[in-house]
Structure formats: C-alpha cells, structure tokens
C-alpha cells in the first residue's frame, strides 16, 4: 500500500528522485506540497489546485480538531471526500500549533493541556489523542505528535523536548492502527548537532514508512537550517521518503534536495499571493508596484497557469490595487504552480544527470545567481 522507489540519483550530490506510493496515488519526488490548513488551500478550489500540478496536500490536525471537528470529517467519509480532493494527503500532528498558537496551561510527559482559542474550553492533547484524530481524518500520511522547541532555546530545554518527542513517538506507534495510513516520525534537536544526531537515530530506529525533519524555519539563521539538513539527512533511512517541514523557498528547497530531502510544505505561496507578491524566475515581485500598471505582457511567459496564460501583468496589478479577491486567487495559483514546477524541474535534472550543474548555484558556498 505504501512504498518508495528511487528512480535516479545525482552523481555529485545526495539528490534523488523517486515515487512515493500511497492509497490515493503516487507522489513524484522531490515535491512541494501546498498547505490546506483547514481542508482548503486558501482562496483556491480543489479543481484549481489540481491544475497547479500539486499531487499531495497538507492539512492540520490542530485546526481541524477545533473546526469543524474530526467527527464531522469522518462522517463525510474522511478528509479526501470532505474537501473533494482525490489525491494523496498528509496531516500534521498539530504539535507545532499547540506550542506556538495555543494558550498553554500545562506540558508534561503525558501531553499538553491548552485553552481552545475559539471558545476557551480546555483541551487535553496527548500523543494518543493526536493519533486518534488523524486516524479519524483519514489522510494518507499522519505525523507523530512531537514537541517543537522554540528558537532560541537552552540545551536543557531541547533535551527535554527530544526526550518527550521520542517517548511520544513510541506511544503514537502503539496507538496507530489504521493500515491504510502511514505514520511518519519527526526529528527534533534544535540547533544542537549532537541532539539532532541522537534524535535522527532514535526516530530512524522505529523503521516507519517515512521520516520528517522538524523544528526548522522557527527563527534560526538559514545557515543553521542548512547545517541541520546536512547533518541529519544521512542518518535517515535512504529507502524511505524524507520530509523537511515548513520549507518552501527555492534556495532552501534546492539545498535540501542536494542533501537528500524529498518532500516540502510551506504556506509561503498563498501567503505571498494574498499580499500581492508573485514568484517569477527566482525573484519576488510586488504587483502593487506602479511599474506594472502599463505592462500588458504575461506575468511569466514560461508558466502555463491560468494567471499567466489568461491575464497580463497590468490586469493583475489592477486586481491587486483594487483589492479584488480574484487577484489573490490568481496570484496564489501562480505561486503554487511555480514551486511545484521548481521541484519537478529538480526531479527532471536529476534524471537527466545535470542537477549539480543546473541547481548547484543555490548552494550556500556558491556566489552564482541562479535563474530557472
């Protein structure tokens, strides 16, 4: 039901392209996954989302538990039917949101008690509860409940977070009984190399269908994130998919793929789109800028999305300046398409044997400016 086949390797880096098989179809890697936190990618219908080339979509356990509730989703036949998406799906455990968004009352080895920001009621979230919610939601991949330490954090605090994360993973494995759903573990460890290595080996020992690197993109310098990926990835099973959580910029994805990462997710493309910013040729353009007012050329002539094939820069500029909802939708569609295209281009470069030539300029030690 689940399998991962590596189709090609880069001879000069650790980059690889492969196919991750799920009950709802294959995911070609490396691949960017759009974020549909509340069973919707903001401002985009599932039909529009499918046309971006997206294959796997991420939703969030914490937010769906609060609204509408996993029982509503389960009654609809699961997350796929509830949102009308027929492709693969992944649910984050909600651990990051509990620690970053919730009003924490208590955290201990048992789990977390926090206050529901919607109605003020107390919620007791344990690894077992998070796993049960995800089984009810029914995504193809569920993530283990973990403790993501903030940045910066003391070494003792990160040690405690790692200890809990590993103990909670064991409890998630015990609680997880749904055979048509894969459970991924999450590596933590903050910016402490020895803790990252210990966490990677601990999580890898469970021999799960896949592994994620978490606790990045939480405020640490980019160089720290690069080092974490470089140090941790070789310790993860090479025959299983590796998922770098919360990363979606071109440079960071290229560097991560060069180090053997397969999957990514990030809210960046839709967040940028909602603020009038588009991704073109490796750059970010603010379409509110007056320079686009008289520009009647396509946004990106090389892009096949509806924003680029059906509209001009001047029209998109007009929509954004007029605060028309259509503008936000079109820009979000374009940005997702760009990130999916970028990961697809990396996969093709790996197959063609030119990944290191085409994407090496993204490496932090290279001064070259890369456009694609």
From Swiss-Prot:
Pathway, per record: tRNA modification; tRNA-queuosine biosynthesis
This protein's cofactor list reads: Zn(2+)
The record's catalysed reaction(s) read: 7-aminomethyl-7-carbaguanine + guanosine(34) in tRNA = 7-aminomethyl-7-carbaguanosine(34) in tRNA + guanine
PANTHER family, per the entry:
QUEUINE TRNA-RIBOSYLTRANSFERASE
Specify the species: Synechococcus sp. (strain CC9605)
**Catalytic residues (UniProt):** 92 (proton acceptor), 265 (nucleophile)
For this chain, the annotated S-S bridges are: none
Quaternary structure and interacting proteins, as annotated = Homodimer. Within each dimer, one monomer is responsible for RNA recognition and catalysis, while the other monomer binds to the replacement base PreQ1.
Coiled-coil ranges from the UniProt annotation: none
* Gene Ontology biological process: queuosine biosynthetic process; tRNA wobble guanine modification; tRNA-guanine transglycosylation
GO CC, sorted alphabetically, is: cytosol
Binding-site positions, Zn(2+): 303, 305, 308, 334
Residue ranges for the region (RNA binding) are: 246-252, 270-274
Quote the Gene3D superfamilies the UniProt record gives.
Queuine tRNA-ribosyltransferase-like
Top EC category? transferase
Protein family? Belongs to the queuine tRNA-ribosyltransferase family.
Residues bound to substrate are: 92-96, 146, 188, 215
How many cofactor units bind, and how?
Binds 1 zinc ion per subunit.
| Stated name of the protein | Queuine tRNA-ribosyltransferase
> Taxonomically, which superkingdom?
Bacteria
List membrane-spanning regions: none
User: Mind listing the UniProt keywords for this protein, alphabetically?
Assistant: Glycosyltransferase, Metal-binding, Queuosine biosynthesis, Transferase, tRNA processing, Zinc
